[in-house]
Amino acid sequence: MSKQKTLKGSFSLCGKGLHTGLSLTVTFNPAPENTGYKIQRIDLEGEPVIQAVAENVVETQRGTVLGKGDIRVSTIEHGMSALYALGIDNCLIQVNGPEFPILDGSAAPYVEKIQSIGIQEQNAEKDYYIIRHKIEVKDDNGSVITILPDEDFSITAMCSFESKFINSQFATLEKMETYAEEIASARTFVFVRDIMPLLEANLIKGGDLDNAIVIYERQVEQAQLDQLADHLKVPHMDANKLGYIQHRPLQWENECTRHKLLDIIGDMALIGKPIKGRIIATRPGHTVNNKFARLMRKEIRKHEIQAPIYDPNEEPIMDNIRIRQLLPHRYPMQLVDKVIAMGPNSIVGVKNVTSNEPFFTGHFPEEPVMPGVLQVEAMAQCGGLLVLNQLEEPERWSTYFMKLDDVKFRKKVVPGDTLLFRVELLAPVRHGISSMKGYMFVGDQVVAEATFTAQIVKNK
């Protein structure tokens, strides 16, 4: 099972802000397990912190802007994209102004710094959200983001720029491992027709050809183009000649769409969990990206506890024979058939409930229902396997109940059900005492849960 990750150390990047033109420094720091992403405005009194989650986004017109009260932080998407793509789960980001520096207009400077400083694996397990069904969002501009079930994460972006100069494009990222090579250095881009109103409003004080691809694809008045050339500090151009206005050539023919894909990943970082699924984005932008991220957070809250994935064709980690070697239970009290996943702090087990179970004879003859006490016992046996598997000579130890708390039965368990148990250690085992939280699923539904404390005794 994958572990959460943070940075091995801190790093800083300095540059000017795209919108403000201010000289800014952003510092990325390691953070404890389960922190997520937090952004701190160290230039303000009290150094307030904003949790980087989708519902804290207050503006998406010219980028992703986080807000809390009167506090704002903008131009965060490139840094967030790099963190998410490189598997960083926990990070405290400190910035001394209202936006991150634009740098070269891509995520490459962040990726280079993260790779240089290194990534630290933490003890807590990474909490993936696994897509089990199609989820889709749309907006009035024809933008659509769809996510489908998949074993890993991948993303395809399709863009139509409504321009004769740039054709429709698509870009695909099949594996996050190729993000640094295929996506990170894709630069932000802007059309001349969109720049002119921003220039007149004095809103892109830090924009230049070092941090953006400027595309002249619709003719404007010569005077307007001259004004833009003066701002960009380039020679005046013929307003009749369309093309790219840039210092550096395109890295890829579809660099603009690759950057759109980069932005999607940055906005996805605000979901708060890594995702396993396949995203197909048509005409993406920060507004629909944030709408998608908000919907995903609602979906996650509805399914806070996800059932483990069970493929009966896969070989178990622990079969019935090995279970009998570790546990003293025998028929009819051995209630775990096999173990399909196990990490240092969690385990997933399986039991197939059949009509031949002896307890159905009296519970109840006309309406067979698995007794709740045996459901708890089954979860506890699974937890016992987790603890015993970490001991030397586990066959010489036994586990005994000490306490049960927060026991809940949500649905009947009947013949024909396949039970999935997910049991997690709540704290390291100390002085032979273990505390665990167990969930029992039928399909995607939680049917029972309990918190239990057990004692581990060497008795053989």
Question: Where would I find each of the regions flagged by the language model?
Answer:
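Residues located in well-ordered beta-strands
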Residues: 335-338, 403, 408, 422-424, ...
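Hydrophobic residues positioned within well-ordered beta-strands of beta-sheet architectures
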Residues: 24, 155-157, 349, 421-422, ...
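C-terminal regulatory domains involved in ligand/effector binding and gene-expression control
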Residues: 1-89, 94-310
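Active-site helix/loop of acyl-thioester processing domains in fatty-acid/polyketide metabolism
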Residues: 258-271, 339, 369-394
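Hydrophobic beta-strand-centered segment that forms part of the acyl-chain substrate-binding groove
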Residues: 272-281, 308-317, 383-420, 447, ...
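Non-catalytic linker/capping segments at the edges of enzyme domains
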Residues: 302-369, 396-398, 413-414, 426-428, ...
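Flexible glycine-rich active-site/ligand-binding loops centered on an Asp-His dyad
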Residues: 171-189, 370, 440-448, 452-460
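Short Pro/Gly-enriched beta-strand edge/turn motifs at strand-loop
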Residues: 6-10, 317-323, 420-421
